[in-house]
């Protein structure tokens, strides 16, 4: 895996490709939110698991805008299944406490749960609950 800072104005979150007989995943960290970077990583891992890197295809993840829709939808479903293996059946309200409960029930961080709920259109992107989500750098600083 390789990290390359996002290009100014660029829209690339990640790329998966092959070099000799090995897959390579490149992440830009674009957006910096931990949930977004984690999903980009899992999306590119799904391309690798599905063997796309072996076909001489470079898989570029630009916020879901690249690649044929059928392939990208399958890759997104696989990546999402790794985050929420049992799917998502929201039962709590969407207050911070409700999201924390839902995240705990699903074994993910509240930041990841917020990102999934936003991606599913269940809570808006401009939601108050997402304003203070940690960046990747902030999240890594808490690991010890």
Show which residues each predicted segment covers:
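Active-site hotspot residues in diverse enzymes, especially metal/ion-binding acidic/histidine motifs
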Residues: 1-144
């Amino acid at each position: 895996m390789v990290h390359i800072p996002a290009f100014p104005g660029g829209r690339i979150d990640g790329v998966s490709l092959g070099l000799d007989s090995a897959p390579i995943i490149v992440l830009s960290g674009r957006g910096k939110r931990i949930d977004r970077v984690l999903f980009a990583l899992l999306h590119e891992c799904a391309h690798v698991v599905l063997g796309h890197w072996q076909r001489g295809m470079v898989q570029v993840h630009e916020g879901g805008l690249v690649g044929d829709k059928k392939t990208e939808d399958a890759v997104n479903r696989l990546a999402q299944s790794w985050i929420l293996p049992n799917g998502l059946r929201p039962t709590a309200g969407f207050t911070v406490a409700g999201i924390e409960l839902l995240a705990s029930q699903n074994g993910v961080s509240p930041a990841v749960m917020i990102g999934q709920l936003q991606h599913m259109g269940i809570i808006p992107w401009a939601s108050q609950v997402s304003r203070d989500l940690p960046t990747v750098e902030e999240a890594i600083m808490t690991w010890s």
